[in-house]
Amino acid sequence: MDRVAFTLFGIDIMWYGILMACGMILGTLIAIKEAKRVGIKEDDVLNIAIIAIPVGLICARIYYVVFNWSYYAQNMSQIFNFRGGGLAIHGGLIGGILAGYIYTKIKNINFLKMADTVILGMPLAQAIGRWGNFINGEAHGGATNLPWGIMVDGVKVHPTFLYESIWDFGIFIVLLLFRKNKKYEGQVIVTYITLYSIGRFFIEGLRTDSLMLGPLRMAQVISLIGVIGGIIAHVYLSKKNKNNISEE
């Protein structure tokens, strides 16, 4: 499939970028709508999006380049070439969450409440963005005989982009359904991190283009940390909420 959607003023506009932009815009609109429901200023959500999205993209690229340094050390000019892909979601999440945290501290806003609001549309944005990997012919798995395998370079392989897209969409539905009944501030983002990490850990094991640190697949390492951290955060925040209720 052609990676180029169309050409504008002599510049090729890539499907990868279009799908990512659509996901980000939709995710931001969902967050703004959720902000109205929970009493958060829409301007603050928009400001966080304006800050966190570019910071997240830069961090996603840095993460990808660092763990592909053997290639980029020989091709320095490609470090700033975003158009062909090469963004790591874990780097983007870390950068985006950190940017949002700093903003809430400066503005004296409840970080966990804001995080629950902003993260709601994130898995849907990811589900859409993963189709950019399909168009680029990347982020696929190894050979398979399963009927839903896709052909890449004459070999039928696991469509891991599809597995993750479906998983991400499922997470979005889960968050959408239970957010109104959450037990504590931060439960939505903790649930997102935990569920995404579980799915990514297993899906990553099928991929053939994993970012490596020695013998370790970095996405699996980060995902394992995400699961453990999510469980610890859930226990801590649940206990903290119960203590606050008791004191009241």
From Swiss-Prot:
Membrane topology classification: Multi-pass membrane protein
Cellular compartment(s): Cell membrane
Keyword Transmembrane applies: yes
Membrane-crossing segments per the record: 6-26, 47-67, 84-104, 186-206, 218-238
GO cellular component, one term: plasma membrane
UniProt name for this protein: Phosphatidylglycerol--prolipoprotein diacylglyceryl transferase
Keywords: Cell membrane, Membrane, Transferase, Transmembrane, Transmembrane helix
One of the protein's GO biological processes: lipoprotein biosynthetic process
Superkingdom to which the source organism belongs: Bacteria
Native species: Clostridioides difficile (strain 630)
